[in-house]
């Protein structure tokens, strides 16, 4: 139920409420009490419930609350009111994207994404002792790099997974796990972009449509290869999802959410930054860096993995 600073509520019938300023998770006759000071984020999946007093206590303590449904998409996210330099940052963001049509930030994000995909493949080439095409990615544009990347990923996965390429509508375990895991990543990124004062709906790469979190999708591209790594590592180690009717079963969704959140709380190494940090801390730091770069009209250096 608990993954370090993330509280995952996924068991059918679980209920979260407040007692004496403590978060209480009840499931049948079992109860667990947790101090809000020990939690940064609550993930709650379908078939669970949470009281308004628990939501109030969470937000008062700066805890975000993320809701995920059964179809690998988020219902929504509740954020505490902690936002920095909003007006100045959003104005600069609008001017950069709409007025000047500044492509520097989007280009750096895509460059970092391809670099991280290459680093991910290189890691597995080293660990498995087999050759792959990690060098080829660096000379290709995004669509071509993606084709090479996913083709190589398919060779790394156990045959019973049945993955033969990235497809958001795919019904194999890996594609479904990617959808669900990316949804968790999107909500985490949404949170930190908003806190940094950026407009999550105004992006550099993805098209702006009503309700489309364009900047969230843009920004996530740099971090997706690490999410891919977490899933490949888990599936190669025997982790499996239970799927029924084209959906991940409830208990498996909870297991997957815990796996991803735990992985995001592992330390990652970043090029040109020797300070150890978790992936979540890296996301938060880069949201602040991007906001600062946009406000000041300066270059932004994207997130680049070392593995």
Swiss-Prot record:
Signal peptide: none annotated. Its cofactor is Mg(2+); Mn(2+). Disulfide bonds: none annotated. It comes from the Archaea. One of its GO terms (biological process) is CRISPR-cas system. Keywords: Antiviral defense, DNA-binding, Endonuclease, Hydrolase, Magnesium, Manganese, Metal-binding, Nuclease, RNA-binding. CRISPR (clustered regularly interspaced short palindromic repeat), is an adaptive immune system that provides protection against mobile genetic elements (viruses, transposable elements and conjugative plasmids). CRISPR clusters contain spacers, sequences complementary to antecedent mobile elements, and target invading nucleic acids. CRISPR clusters are transcribed and processed into CRISPR RNA (crRNA). Acts as a dsDNA endonuclease. Involved in the integration of spacer DNA into the CRISPR cassette. This is CRISPR-associated endonuclease Cas1 2. It comes from Saccharolobus solfataricus (strain ATCC 35092 / DSM 1617 / JCM 11322 / P2). The lineage of its organism: Archaea, Thermoproteota, Thermoprotei, Sulfolobales, Sulfolobaceae.
């Amino acid at each position: 139920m608990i993954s370090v600073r993330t509280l995952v509520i996924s068991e059918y019938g679980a209920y979260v409420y407040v007692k004496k300023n403590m978060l209480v998770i009840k499931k049948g006759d079992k109860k667990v009490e947790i101090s809000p000071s020990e939690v940064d984020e609550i993930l709650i999946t379908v078939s669970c419930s949470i009281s308004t007093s628990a939501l109030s206590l969470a937000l008062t303590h700066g805890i975000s609350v993320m809701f995920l449904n059964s179809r690998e998409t988020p219902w929504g996210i509740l954020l505490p009111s902690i936002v920095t330099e909003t007006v100045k940052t959003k104005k600069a963001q609008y001017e950069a994207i709409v007025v000047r049509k500044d492509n520097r930030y989007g280009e750096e994000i895509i460059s970092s994404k391809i670099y991280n995909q290459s680093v991910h493949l290189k890691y597995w080439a080293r660990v498995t002792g087999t050759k792959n095409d990690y060098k080829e990615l660096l000379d290709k544009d995004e669509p071509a790099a993606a084709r090479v990347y996913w083709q190589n990923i398919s060779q790394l996965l156990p045959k019973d997974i049945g993955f033969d390429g990235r497809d958001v509508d795919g019904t194999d375990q890996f594609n479904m796990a990617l959808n669900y895991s990316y949804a968790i990543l999107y909500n985490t990124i949404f949170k930190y972009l908003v806190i940094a004062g950026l407009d999550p709906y105004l992006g550099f790469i993805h098209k702006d449509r009503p309700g489309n979190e364009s900047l969230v999708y843009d920004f996530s591209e740099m971090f997706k290869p690490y999410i891919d790594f977490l899933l490949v590592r888990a599936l190669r180690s025997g982790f499996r999802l239970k799927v029924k009717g084209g959906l991940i079963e409830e208990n498996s969704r909870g297991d997957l959410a815990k796996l991803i959140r735990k992985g995001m709380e592992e330390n990652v190494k970043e090029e040109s930054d020797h300070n150890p940090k978790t992936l979540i801390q890296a996301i938060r730091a880069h949201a602040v860096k991007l906001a600062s770069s946009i406000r000041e009209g300066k270059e932004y250096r994207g997130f680049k993995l070392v593995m």
